[in-house]
């Protein structure tokens, strides 16, 4: 049986065991997608990334992502983990910029390997909002185990073009009391073509942060994701459209506290009005 280099990494935290874990398999050129899915299911993490080395001048490597249930086109925290693994396997400098090819295009990732921890950042486009819901919050609240009045009326519930649902709630107490109804969420996923539920409030646990976040993706086999890179990056467009009205800025969000995976993520956004 052939053996492959395997990495287990936590993104978005400097504390071991916190943040969002991802598995990375290096040199997966000869692993079939069927076997990739089996490996991801055995790992049981929200995502497993497979690095495929290809000789090309257009990018450094190709990557595929799998949840325990199905393949997905993109994953932020697993992209960061994969870039770090690639730099380690190829004995690259402590600071390096990489380009990875995904099923939805190429991503530019910067990796800084430091003594006590490492930093990584990736650049991506943010999808526009596709549709909004105003005052029609009963089913959303029921799916989260909340009362309808706990959802913020001054902001819309919105779905972007990638199928991410954004739900503003009033208080951090509501956020921490969420108890999802998985069956109802799955029904709404099918009805609205959703891929994930991003719930947020401006009330935070750590004063330096802007929003407290929780993210659920039951249709992807992820009951709750600890810290979600892609969803937080996409949130910047919602923030611009409905909260700040400024096309450039910075956000720092906290996530994962309810499941013991405390993490923080920073988002820089610009030219969202272009």
Model-derived segments and spans:
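Active-site proximal loop and beta-alpha junction motif in alpha/beta enzyme cores
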Residues: 1-74, 80-274
